[in-house]
Amino acid sequence: MDTDNIQIEDSSFRDNQGRIVYFNNRILRVVNKIGKKNLDFINESGLLDNSVKKNFLIKTKLLNLKDLPNFFSKYDNVLESEKIPFISYPYEWTFDQLKKAAIHHLDFQIYLFDQGAVLRDSSAYNIQFIGAKPYFIDLLSIKKYEEGEYWIGYKQFCENFLNPLLLGSLKGIQHND
């Protein structure tokens, strides 16, 4: 297989569990040893398939490493995600889109709590729209919930969603001005 078509996404450097890789017009996420345990939990618990079926998570599937070029053999797992037709950013969204994204994020978080899981962060950049529908795109942000654990993404949710929505609705200050 041709490895000339492999490009690592520079902006995915912050994720200590894996990286985004473009290969033959496909979007792949390579998962390292740090992310393997987490991905095993997500997959074995049914969260991967069920989160996709419930339209919380963008369509994502595990790939067989044997079907990929040797470049990928150094990783523990490789995931493929549905390609998003148009990438948008929170600072480009309307007030209503930010509100939809926030509600989607909270609905997904509540679903995950019910399944014994939690989101480790609450970045608005983990949401993308396909048409008017928001989808969560960062599978490895899901982790097993530890009893008594505080929602570690709460502060980031307030910064990325709640505060801009409050300022917009109460004071007319738009988050994207």
Label every PLM stretch briefly.
Residues 1-24, 63:
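ATP-binding glycine-rich phosphate-binding loop
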Residues 17-42, 91, 95:
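ATP-binding glycine-rich loop module of kinase domains
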Residues 42-55, 94-120, 164:
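Conserved kinase catalytic-core helix
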Residues 56-104:
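Conserved structural core of kinase catalytic domains
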Residues 84-97, 108-109, 120-124, 139-147:
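Short acidic, glycine/Ser/Thr-rich loop/turn "cap" segments at secondary-structure junctions
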Residues 118-172:
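Catalytic activation segment of kinase domains across protein kinase-like and atypical kinase folds
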Residues 174-177:
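A conserved mid-domain beta-alpha-beta active-site/ligand-binding segment of alpha/beta enzyme cores
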